[in-house]
Structures are given as C-alpha cells and as structure tokens.
Amino acid sequence: MSLVQSTAAMSFFRLSNLRCKSILGCGAFFILAALASPAATLPTGFTETEFGGSLSGAPTAMEFSPDGRLFICLQTGQVRIIKNGSLLATPFLSLSVDSSGERGLLGVAFDPNFFTNHYVYVYYTVPTFPIHNRVSRFTAAGDVTAPGSEVVILNLDNLSSATNHNGGALHFGPDGKLYIGVGENANGANAQTLSNLLGKVLRINSNGSIPTDNPFYNSATGNNRAIWALGLRNPFTFAFQPGMTRMFINDVGESTYEEINDGIAGSNYGWPVTEGPTNNPSFRSPIYFYQHDIGCAIVGGAFYNPPVLQFPSSYLGKYFFADLCAGWIHVFNPASGMTTDFASGINTPVDLHVGPDGALYYLDRGSGGQVFRVSALPAQALNISGRAAVETGQGVAISGFIVTGTVPKRVGVRAIGPSLANFGIADALMDPVLQLNRADGSLVMANDNWKNTQQAQLMAAGLAPANDNEAALIATLPAGNYSAIVSGKNGGTGVALAEVYDLDPTSNSRLANVSTRAHVGTDSDVLISGFITGNRIGATRVAIRALGPSLQKFGIANPLPDPQLALVNANGTLLASDDDWQTHQAQAAAITSYGLAPSNNLESAIAISLAPGSYTAIVTGKNNQTGVALIEVYDEQ
C-alpha cells in the first residue's frame, strides 16, 4: 500500500485531534489513489471474483436485503444496489450529507418485516447547522426510494468541529430492536457518560421509541435511555450471529489495540480509561485484541452461519473480520479464542458480509469502490442423470447440461431402458434412441444400440450398458450448452434413464447445470434427476428447480400445473423439499441471488450445499397431477 493510501485509510478511523491538527492535512479517508485493486491471496480451494463492477465513489458500508439485493452506502450520500450481480444505474437513495472527514452516509439496515413494510434505515450526517448524525427510515419502492418517505427515527448529539469517530453501523438484533454504533466524536470523555449518546451502542424500537428494558432506562433521561453499552471509541462495525443472540462489537483503538468485544447489555468497555485487556472490574475486556504492529483499524465483522453452506463446514460459527490498513481478513474462532489468516493483499477493506449464497463478500474502498466475492471451489459434478417417462412428440425426455471452462470436456452419455426392469420399473422403454445436440439444435452424435459404433471405448470407460438395445456414446465437447434427447424407437414409450458422465474430472472444464424435461406421471413415472459430486475442497453448492406452469409460454401444451420438489441422498434420506418456491424466505432469497427465481409462484426450488456423494432430485405433481415438467440442477460457485 502506498503512503498516500495508508494515511488516507488510517484517517477515517484512527486520527484524533491529539494526533493530527487537521484530518485533511493527514490525508482524508475519501482521498484514495485510483489504483487497481490486486487480487487477494486466499487459502487453497478458494477463489475471488469482482461483484457488480466499480461503484464510482467512496463506499462505507453494505448490507444484503432480505430479498438478496446488496445495498452499498457511499460516503457522499448515495445508496447503490447490486441486483443479480449487476450494479443498477439509478441510486436507491441520494441524500445531502456532510461528508467531511469521516462523516457522511455510514450505515444501512432493513426492517425485520421488510417484505411487508419495505422499510430501509440509514445512518448519515446532517449537513445543516447544528451538524449531527441521524438515523432515518425510508420506504423502498422497488429499486428506488418512495418520494417523500423519509421519517426521522433518531437525531444524535450535535457534533464538535472534529469530523472523526462517528461510528455508523446499524443492525436489527434477534429481538427485533435496532442497534446503532456511535463514535465518541474524538472526545473520550463522551464514552463514559450517560448524558449523551456518543461512544455507545444504542438500542431502540423500529419506530424510534426506547425499549423500557434497556439497561440504563431508569438511570438516564430522554434519548439517553437508548444507551445499551458504553465505553467505546469508534464502533464502526458490529455483527449479530444469525440464529443466535450473540453480538460482537469491533472497536477501533487509538495507539495500541484493536478490539473484538462481546456485546452484552449494560457493559462498559473502558475507553478512554483503558484500551485492550484490563483487570479493572468496572470494565469488560475484549474477547480478542491485536496490536498495531499487524494492523491499525478493525473493520467488517461477519459470522459464518449462512442459510446455504458454501464454505467447508469447518468455518461454521467462525467470525470473519478485516483490517483497513493492513489489507487482510482473519477468522476468529469464538470457541478457542484463536485466529487464523484467511486473506491478504486487499487494497482498503471497509466492510464484509456473508451473503445469502454462503459466499463471503468484502467491500474495498480502493479504485473508486468495489465489492469482491470470495467462494470455495465447489466439488466437481462427476455424473448427472435424469429418469423420466418417455412419450412421443413433446413428451420425449430431454436432459440438458453445460460444459464450462477453457478446454474441451470428454463426456459419456447413455440412454438406459430395458435394464431398468431389474430395478422394479414395470414400464421401461424397451429400445431407447439417443441424440446429443448442440444449443442451436444441430446434431453432435446419435446412437441406437450401443454396440453399433463405440463399443470398445464404452467398455474401456466402464460405461457399457447391460442391455444391447440401450444407447450410449462418448464425445469430446467444447464449452457450451448441450441436450441429450431420449426417444423410443418406432414411437415406443416407457420409462428411461438419461445419464451424462464426466470422463475427465481433473481437467479445467466442468459439467454444470443439468436439466431434464419430460412427462410427470404418478408412482414410478415421476421425474427423477440424479447427480454425483466429487471431492474438491468445499461443498458443492447447488440450486434445483422444478418448473411446470411457465413451460406453457415455450409451447408445451400440457405443463405440470403445480410441481413439488424433493432431494434425497444415497440412503433415501430426505434432505430438503419445496412446494411453491417463495414459501421459505431465506431459501427464496438465495435462489433470487443466483438469478434463478422461477417466474411462477407454484414452481419449486431448493438451494443447498452438498458433501461429496450421490443425490436424487424428484419432481411429482401436487395431488397426483400429471403433465410435462422441467427439473434443473445448477452448480453455483
């Protein structure tokens, strides 16, 4: 990091009037060299991608909305949205703010009832005299703010001429209350008094009223009854552990320590009397701290407890945090109190969150502002299959798949029919015919009776079908979309199994996103898609969809009216199920974040992370309905 970048970054969190007469003279936080952000150094098995493009501004915070969009605060007063991986051109919100020093738009949060009331809360510095920080509520109207919807929730104390130590983090806790981190405005004495809100964590109701069970409700007066914890210098970031009541507060120190504090009601964390660990019984020591030889300003803070597991399970319950100046991300284990290195070489991280897809997102203030997504390399999909009732016309079975990567992929494709009778399938297709087509419908290869063409190759690959009337082929395919079409010879009908095998799993290309379209009947004639995951680092993160009603707009005359979806493992144990994809909010948010939201509410979807093994997705009709359905299995990285 250059000297210009380093001092610029440090001033936003650390410099006080005692250490620097003029913050701008020391290099204000928003003045950063426009250098390209280098790729972070990550552990083996992880990868990083830019998410959404340049923000063209100085970001301060970000938060995922309950529906999966990413909202990003710019210090100058704009809230930008990244939706389905793209930065929207129109800001969600544009405010007039005082953005001098560390002031500006500093935090955003979403009401627990966002799907109903569409309330969005922000923390910003009012630009008119007397200058102060404020929490306001706005109503979302899609991807923009409803005009005239601002409701002031809380006005904080008037600020001195010092423009640093504003805090700005705000999050709703598991109790439905709004928690707010407030800096001490470069005056340590503020942190030790109940006569103002500075240097504190506050707790209020969503409408701005103060809960009567706050720890200082009966000892403070007026708005100061909102104080929940005190003795903090600049709690710029904090986080709640999803599904738990635990809260970690990151406090930026002055000359010695950066702190992670256990957020406990009524606690006094000691600033300015003490910094870092203390034996004073009046103060609560941090649960983790580090000295300034490895960093200068703690930021971020996110527990790894996502609705969809994308990282290896060993990360569950761990706490990710970053340092603004040192440009690293570390992982804290609350159980052991130990930390491990995770990422280094980041330009200027200011915030990080775990997304609804289970990936880790960090906000980099360098190069005009960027978001980066860190994900575990998923396990390899080794083979995929679809079992369905094969009819004529639109009722043939179609299994689609995608080859990704930079080198061609060698695959084996089979159409199994007669040998299914050995597994109790009474109406098996007696003579399947197999076609492999490109996305434009052109033929790659075809086969009827596997011994006719590639017998030696199929036997060498271990793919020789059990019955001579079954079809199989081997092809080497460049990246692209492909369809394996199974029909009955001479118009024959019955249940068949289409299989696609990865015959070169160690190459840089992969099989992904399998789909099968066929008629869904009852009993053994339901639609089944099986897949096997191999053993790379990390779980395989998949999204599975069962589509029916929306097929009508593609010319399917008899789509399945209401598909139901179930996922089982090799032992037949049910792992997940869905009927109507919007029923489960967390899962719906993950599906939406992948850009895979079905167009009809009656269609089903599952987002899940899977360990190496064999899995089966099953589509049935609700109340024994029948019709054509499409099952899709997406490999999400």
Predicted regions and their residues:
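Conserved blade-ending motifs and adjacent loop-strand segments that build the rim/top face
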Residues: 338-356
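Beta-strand-rich domains and repeat architectures in extracellular enzymes and scaffolds
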Residues: 52-77, 299
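Asp-box/WD-like beta-propeller blade repeats and closely related beta-sheet repeat scaffolds
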Residues: 132-171
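A short helix->beta-strand "capping" segment at the edge of beta-propeller domains
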Residues: 40-55, 150, 285-287
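A sequence-level detector for low-complexity, Ser/Thr- and acidic-rich stretches
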Residues: 378-637
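Beta-propeller domain segments
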Residues: 41, 57, 103-105, 113-115, ...
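Surface loop/turn motifs at the tips and blade-to-blade linkers of beta-strand repeat domains
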Residues: 50-55, 92-100, 154-161, 227-231, ...
